[in-house]
Amino acid sequence: MKVSVIITTYNAVDWLQKVLIGYSVQTESDFEIVIADDGSTSETKDLISKLSSKFKNPIIHVWHEDHGFQKTKILNKAILKSNSDYLIFTDGDCIPRKDFVEMHLKYREIGYFLSGGYFKLPLSISKLISEKDIIDSNCFKLSWLKINGFKLNFKSIKLTNNRYIAQFMNWITPTKRSWNGHNSSGWKCDILAVNGFNNEMQYGGEDREMGERMFNNGMLSKQIRYSAICIHLDHSRGYSSPEIWKNNNKIRAYNKKNSIIKTDNGIDKV
């Protein structure tokens, strides 16, 4: 098994189904899927059971009871259930382009984690995307998006699907090479070395916090936001609040000031 793809989800079966269809047509086939389920109802379990029989890749469903936003805890549990030494992390609202897994494997390197991004779609187009659109890669084509009402902008260059342009844009982009939960990957040993995700973190920078501790441990990162492409399906974010952001930022500031590597409340506590 070359890689484990860890996908977070919470009560969003329509989006998760589209995402899993995207992983069923990847150019790289040697991977497993680990669903990190933050307390969804049985509807998600039923979907995974239905799709598992059709997929050539193994799907592992890791679930815990719903006690509010506990993404970091379920991610830590999913890491422990994974069967590969290299892990890709993404979300259940991000449909991968066919070469998504291939690109992560192509650019992986000892001593580095990979930092990707997403191409955000409005809710109207998110709902329009069909199984055929995913299998045929229509939803990654600028012509299809434009026909369906998407207004092209400078970010649309992400979908040009030209490797030379992608490499150039990866090189010149001013975007920080942070750990982004919707599209990042790294070696399991490097994640375990910092004790995984911080269980105290709620929504807002919880993924980047782990990446910052990896930097404190001497890790470097590569920018692949124009090479490993996924499209983001729109949704509400009722679990975010200014108070939560304030607490998360306080933790990150403390880590930076004190060069914290291992969290005291991480993967060894789940």
Where are the predicted features?
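Short, well-formed alpha-helical segments that are part of the catalytic scaffolds
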Residues: 12-25
